[in-house]
Amino acid sequence: MPSSDIHVSAVVVRNSRGEVLCVRKKGTALFQFPGGKPEFAESSLDAVIREVNEELGISLDAALLVPMGTYRAVAANEVGSDVVADLFYYSDSVQPVAAAEIAECAWVNPSVPNVKLAPLLKDEVFPELIANPVRSVAVFTGASSGRNHTNAILAEALGAGLAEQGVRMIYGGGKVGLMGAAADACLANGGCVIGVIPQNLVDGEIAHAGLSHLEIVDTMYQRKQRMSDLVDAYVCLPGGAGTLDEFFDAWTAQQLGLHRKPIALFGSSFWAPTVSMLKHMADEGFIRQDDVDTLIVADTVDELLVALNSWAAPCPKWN
């Protein structure tokens, strides 16, 4: 039996390729998550923000840290002890610089680790990430509700389902139309909703005032880029030109290998004409059939999440 427990706060930072940021401390051989021991009376959240800033020069945004729970494993460097870690999930673009106790940083694919891992990572957390890699999704949809009432039902079902499964929702930040319907349903069921909206659309789309967090950016391009930085997957609800723009932007980037994140079309009847057009383009030789086949089409949240979590990235077009 371990003689003592070592309590730490740590963070799982994930990049657009699905890799996880790991660090090796000076004088040790195994890689672990960034973080460390809380100081007296310091919360787990404050501790991980402080430690990551001191050791890697990264300023974590507290609003974007998602609690994962508490994990226990054999300590990597202290014989006869267990490490008890309060973990947070952070999906964002970061540039770590090793400092203080850190000797080395590495971005690690949980499925094919290229470094030696501490037991907490190898035995507990990475298997969970492999089984359920999707923790945050971008929801693309319209700022209007459309003419078909089933659109709102789809949006509400998606928002509620994401909340019930503990999946964070990132969307365009509006409170009207299907955007608002999905966000309200997620919030009403205890979910975390982050909005990203350009300044010039704050008044036009009426920014949602009740979100978990709202970011205001300068341009539509920055909105798409920011949403992409924060998520593990993309889900498209019914929408118009803006929704199509967001979908094709994410899909093109996927084809080029700029990210390895699944894309889903939620509501098969609405998206049937789009899928038909894409198949026609594939038949004409303008799109690879493999890229069309990797798109997920779903009608229920359970079906959607199973498909997102079991998805395999296609080979990049120009690889």
Question: Model-derived features: where do they sit?
Answer:
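Active-site-adjacent beta-strand/loop module that shapes the phosphate/pyrophosphate-binding cleft
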Residues: I6, V66, Y71-V97, P110
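Glycine-rich, small/polar surface segments that engage phosphate groups of diverse ligands
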Residues: Y171-M220
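A charged, well-structured terminal subsegment
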Residues: D229-Y234, E284-N319
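Glycine-rich beta-alpha loop segments
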Residues: P133-C192
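Short, acidic/small-residue loops that bind anionic groups at enzyme active sites
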Residues: I197, L237, W251-S276, I287-V292
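The catalytic Nudix box helix
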Residues: F33-M68
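Conserved N-terminal beta-strand and adjoining loop/helix that marks the start
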Residues: P2-V20, K37
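NUDIX/MutT-family hydrolases
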Residues: D86-S91, V97-A131, T300
